[in-house]
Protein backbone atom coordinates (compact mmCIF):
# COMPACT_ATOMS: atom_id res chain seq x y z
CA UNK A 1 0.00 0.00 0.00
CA UNK A 2 1.36 3.40 -0.97
CA UNK A 3 -0.39 6.72 -0.37
CA UNK A 4 1.10 9.92 -1.79
CA UNK A 5 0.26 13.52 -1.05
CA UNK A 6 1.39 15.46 -4.12
CA UNK A 7 1.82 19.23 -3.53
CA UNK A 8 -1.40 19.17 -1.49
CA UNK A 9 -2.98 22.45 -0.44
CA UNK A 10 -6.28 23.15 1.29
CA UNK A 11 -7.57 26.66 1.82
CA UNK A 12 -10.66 27.88 3.64
CA UNK A 13 -11.13 31.40 2.30
CA UNK A 14 -7.88 33.24 3.05
CA UNK A 15 -6.77 30.65 5.63
CA UNK A 16 -4.38 27.94 4.41
CA UNK A 17 -4.84 24.79 6.50
CA UNK A 18 -2.48 22.56 4.48
CA UNK A 19 0.25 24.22 2.41
CA UNK A 20 1.95 22.36 -0.47
CA UNK A 21 2.37 19.08 1.41
CA UNK A 22 4.27 16.34 -0.40
CA UNK A 23 4.88 13.00 1.31
CA UNK A 24 4.65 9.25 0.75
CA UNK A 25 3.36 6.70 3.25
CA UNK A 26 3.50 2.91 3.09
CA UNK A 27 2.48 0.29 5.67
CA UNK A 28 3.37 1.35 9.20
CA UNK A 29 2.31 3.91 11.78
CA UNK A 30 2.42 7.64 11.06
CA UNK A 31 1.65 10.28 13.67
CA UNK A 32 0.69 13.84 12.85
CA UNK A 33 1.98 16.31 15.41
CA UNK A 34 1.19 19.98 15.57
CA UNK A 35 -0.62 22.71 17.44
CA UNK A 36 -4.37 23.20 17.19
CA UNK A 37 -5.21 24.57 13.76
CA UNK A 38 -2.08 23.11 12.14
CA UNK A 39 -4.13 21.16 9.57
CA UNK A 40 -3.91 17.62 10.99
CA UNK A 41 -7.64 16.93 10.92
CA UNK A 42 -7.99 18.68 7.56
CA UNK A 43 -5.31 16.39 6.12
CA UNK A 44 -7.08 13.33 7.54
CA UNK A 45 -10.44 14.48 6.17
CA UNK A 46 -8.90 14.88 2.71
CA UNK A 47 -7.34 11.41 2.96
CA UNK A 48 -10.81 10.07 3.82
CA UNK A 49 -12.35 11.93 0.82
CA UNK A 50 -14.51 14.09 3.09
CA UNK A 51 -12.79 17.26 1.84
CA UNK A 52 -11.32 17.94 -1.58
CA UNK A 53 -7.96 19.68 -1.78
CA UNK A 54 -7.78 23.20 -3.19
CA UNK A 55 -4.84 22.01 -5.29
CA UNK A 56 -2.58 18.99 -5.55
CA UNK A 57 -3.63 15.37 -5.34
CA UNK A 58 -3.70 12.26 -3.17
CA UNK A 59 -2.98 8.92 -4.79
CA UNK A 60 -3.30 5.35 -3.55
CA UNK A 61 -1.07 2.91 -5.40
CA UNK A 62 -0.81 5.45 -8.21
CA UNK A 63 -4.56 6.16 -8.59
CA UNK A 64 -6.28 9.41 -7.60
CA UNK A 65 -8.38 8.60 -4.52
CA UNK A 66 -11.25 10.85 -5.61
CA UNK A 67 -11.49 8.98 -8.93
CA UNK A 68 -11.32 5.57 -7.20
CA UNK A 69 -14.56 6.38 -5.32
CA UNK A 70 -15.98 3.30 -3.50
CA UNK A 71 -12.96 1.17 -4.47
CA UNK A 72 -10.86 3.50 -2.30
CA UNK A 73 -13.38 3.85 0.52
CA UNK A 74 -13.50 0.05 0.83
CA UNK A 75 -9.79 0.21 1.74
CA UNK A 76 -10.42 2.80 4.43
CA UNK A 77 -11.26 2.74 8.14
CA UNK A 78 -11.84 6.10 9.82
CA UNK A 79 -12.41 7.29 13.36
CA UNK A 80 -13.10 11.04 13.48
CA UNK A 81 -12.52 13.13 16.61
CA UNK A 82 -16.26 13.07 17.25
CA UNK A 83 -18.33 10.22 15.89
CA UNK A 84 -22.04 9.58 16.01
CA UNK A 85 -23.80 6.53 17.35
CA UNK A 86 -27.32 5.51 18.24
CA UNK A 87 -27.52 5.78 22.05
CA UNK A 88 -30.15 3.02 22.33
CA UNK A 89 -28.01 0.48 20.44
CA UNK A 90 -25.88 -1.95 22.40
CA UNK A 91 -22.17 -2.04 21.52
CA UNK A 92 -22.75 -5.25 19.58
CA UNK A 93 -25.80 -3.87 17.73
CA UNK A 94 -23.95 -0.65 16.90
CA UNK A 95 -21.02 -2.54 15.40
CA UNK A 96 -23.32 -4.90 13.46
CA UNK A 97 -25.17 -1.87 12.09
CA UNK A 98 -21.95 -0.15 11.00
CA UNK A 99 -20.73 -3.43 9.46
CA UNK A 100 -23.89 -3.58 7.35
CA UNK A 101 -23.34 0.02 6.20
CA UNK A 102 -19.80 -0.93 5.20
CA UNK A 103 -21.11 -3.89 3.19
CA UNK A 104 -19.64 -6.60 5.42
CA UNK A 105 -21.59 -9.85 4.93
CA UNK A 106 -23.68 -10.77 8.02
CA UNK A 107 -21.86 -14.04 8.76
CA UNK A 108 -18.47 -12.33 8.47
CA UNK A 109 -19.71 -9.31 10.45
CA UNK A 110 -20.89 -11.42 13.38
CA UNK A 111 -17.47 -13.06 13.71
CA UNK A 112 -15.59 -9.79 13.14
CA UNK A 113 -17.70 -7.87 15.68
CA UNK A 114 -17.08 -10.50 18.36
CA UNK A 115 -13.34 -10.47 17.61
CA UNK A 116 -13.09 -6.66 17.67
CA UNK A 117 -15.16 -6.29 20.84
CA UNK A 118 -12.62 -8.55 22.53
CA UNK A 119 -9.64 -6.78 20.92
CA UNK A 120 -10.71 -3.35 22.19
CA UNK A 121 -11.61 -4.67 25.65
CA UNK A 122 -15.40 -4.31 25.55
CA UNK A 123 -16.43 -7.96 26.00
CA UNK A 124 -17.97 -7.33 29.44
CA UNK A 125 -20.14 -4.48 28.10
CA UNK A 126 -20.99 -5.83 24.62
CA UNK A 127 -24.70 -5.89 25.49
CA UNK A 128 -24.72 -2.52 27.25
CA UNK A 129 -26.35 0.44 25.50
CA UNK A 130 -23.95 2.95 23.99
CA UNK A 131 -25.45 5.78 26.07
CA UNK A 132 -24.43 3.93 29.25
CA UNK A 133 -20.74 3.67 28.29
CA UNK A 134 -17.97 5.88 29.63
CA UNK A 135 -16.24 8.24 27.20
CA UNK A 136 -13.27 5.87 26.92
CA UNK A 137 -15.53 2.89 26.21
CA UNK A 138 -17.34 4.85 23.48
CA UNK A 139 -13.95 5.70 21.98
CA UNK A 140 -12.99 2.01 21.96
CA UNK A 141 -16.28 1.19 20.21
CA UNK A 142 -15.33 3.85 17.66
CA UNK A 143 -11.93 2.25 17.15
CA UNK A 144 -13.65 -1.11 16.61
CA UNK A 145 -16.03 0.36 13.99
CA UNK A 146 -13.06 1.80 12.09
CA UNK A 147 -11.55 -1.69 11.85
CA UNK A 148 -14.73 -3.59 10.87
CA UNK A 149 -13.91 -3.89 7.17
CA UNK A 150 -10.29 -4.88 7.89
CA UNK A 151 -9.03 -1.72 6.18
CA UNK A 152 -5.70 -1.37 4.40
CA UNK A 153 -5.64 2.30 5.49
CA UNK A 154 -6.68 3.16 9.04
CA UNK A 155 -7.13 6.84 9.92
CA UNK A 156 -7.66 7.60 13.61
CA UNK A 157 -8.10 11.23 14.65
CA UNK A 158 -7.09 11.61 18.32
CA UNK A 159 -7.80 7.93 19.04
CA UNK A 160 -6.62 7.90 22.66
CA UNK A 161 -8.76 10.85 23.80
CA UNK A 162 -10.73 9.67 26.81
CA UNK A 163 -8.80 6.43 27.29
CA UNK A 164 -7.32 5.67 30.69
CA UNK A 165 -3.57 4.87 30.95
CA UNK A 166 -4.07 1.08 30.79
CA UNK A 167 -6.30 1.39 27.74
CA UNK A 168 -3.72 3.63 26.05
CA UNK A 169 -1.16 0.86 26.47
CA UNK A 170 -3.59 -1.71 25.05
CA UNK A 171 -4.32 0.65 22.16
CA UNK A 172 -0.62 1.22 21.39
CA UNK A 173 -0.07 -2.54 21.29
CA UNK A 174 -3.09 -2.99 19.01
CA UNK A 175 -1.88 -0.26 16.63
CA UNK A 176 1.59 -1.80 16.55
CA UNK A 177 0.05 -5.15 15.61
CA UNK A 178 -2.27 -3.63 12.99
CA UNK A 179 0.46 -1.56 11.34
CA UNK A 180 2.36 -4.64 10.20
CA UNK A 181 -0.26 -5.20 7.48
CA UNK A 182 -1.64 -1.71 6.85
CA UNK A 183 -1.00 2.01 6.87
CA UNK A 184 -2.11 3.64 10.13
CA UNK A 185 -2.35 7.42 10.43
CA UNK A 186 -2.81 8.95 13.90
Regions found by a protein language model. Give the residues of each.
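Walker A (P-loop) phosphate-binding loop of ABC-type ATPase nucleotide-binding domains
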Residues: 35-39
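Conserved ABC transporter NBD signature motif
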Residues: 56-67, 71-72
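Conserved ABC ATPase "signature" region
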Residues: 96, 100, 107-125, 176
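Catalytic Walker B motif of ABC-type/P-loop ATPase nucleotide-binding domains
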Residues: 154-157
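Conserved catalytic loops of ABC-family nucleotide-binding domains
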Residues: 174-186
Amino acid sequence: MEVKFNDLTKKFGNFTAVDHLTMTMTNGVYGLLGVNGAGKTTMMRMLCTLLKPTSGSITCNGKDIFEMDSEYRNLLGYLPQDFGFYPEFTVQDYLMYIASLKGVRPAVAKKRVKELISKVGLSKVANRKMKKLSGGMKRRAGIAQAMLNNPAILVLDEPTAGLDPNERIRFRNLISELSEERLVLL
